[in-house]
């Protein structure tokens, strides 16, 4: 059955485990990790879709999907609770006489959901990652794709050449047509890194997905298989240069850095930008309360907090309690964490629902200390 035909639909790859985030992803998928005081990482991609006029979105989940599924719900925070389209959570599944099961790679994840895509008979399919922090108008990228008469367009972001070996790199001609793709090259020729954002002409992509699935030697991956195969076949592929804030927060260091970016005077992300409001699903909290003794400097604080101590250059999520004479410096304190009196926390990431008793020191200001959610930190605990 074909529902109302869509010009373009988006498919968000959101099943990643995020092992490099360690304690932060023990019980939830990377796109569900909290960010920026009240958001989750996937909020940025969902908001981009909504603000770009894309009203049909499939979210492909796999690892620890419960919290992510509950957060997305019917999609109302992003105006994606629609009868014809909207947001649909797509989990790996098996069918009768079918042993597909878990997604084997990014391309296989899309392949397993071809029927969902075909319901809307789109001209174009936008493939996205659900675990990056950025604000982007995908419609501008689509117009670029159409103007270039491209078969595929890949979003790229300029990185320092010294960092290029950590990314998939696009080598392009002057007109931004791609002539070579190198996955994490030791000696990069270009500084244009793939953002993991692709626009494909759907009928052509479906053909390549079908062929890739039949190849027993394939990794079933866009970067390793689909993109190189299309290039080898001479398809018209272009790089779309994105200018703005974009961060892969896949490591503890990059996650902490992205939060510290929010506190800089020249913050490019700007969560207070009314023209591109980032939407989320959030609980109901009272306004935050600050005692006479509290001291706050260059800090982002959400609702529902009670602060009796000092906070400097930190991001404090909703519902956090900070006791008397406690000092929080260069840190990220996630929702509903309770910090006792005379506690010092420096350059640390404290996850949700942590209880820290009085007179505890966490972090030395050099290495980033991390405390997983729902932990109790007492005098017997050791946090580095």
Curated annotation (Swiss-Prot):
Alpha-D-glucose 1-phosphate binds at residues 103, 168, 183-184, 194. Keywords: ATP-binding, Carbohydrate metabolism, Glycogen biosynthesis, Glycogen metabolism, Nucleotide-binding, Nucleotidyltransferase, Transferase. One of its GO terms (molecular function) is glucose-1-phosphate adenylyltransferase activity. Pathway: Glycan biosynthesis; glycogen biosynthesis. One of its GO terms (biological process) is glycogen biosynthetic process. CDD domains: ADP_Glucose_PP, LbH_G1P_AT_C. The keyword Nucleotidyltransferase applies. Belongs to the bacterial/plant glucose-1-phosphate adenylyltransferase family. This is Glucose-1-phosphate adenylyltransferase. It comes from Fusobacterium nucleatum subsp. nucleatum (strain ATCC 25586 / DSM 15643 / BCRC 10681 / CIP 101130 / JCM 8532 / KCTC 2640 / LMG 13131 / VPI 4355). The lineage of its organism: Bacteria, Fusobacteriati, Fusobacteriota, Fusobacteriia, Fusobacteriales. The gene is glgC.
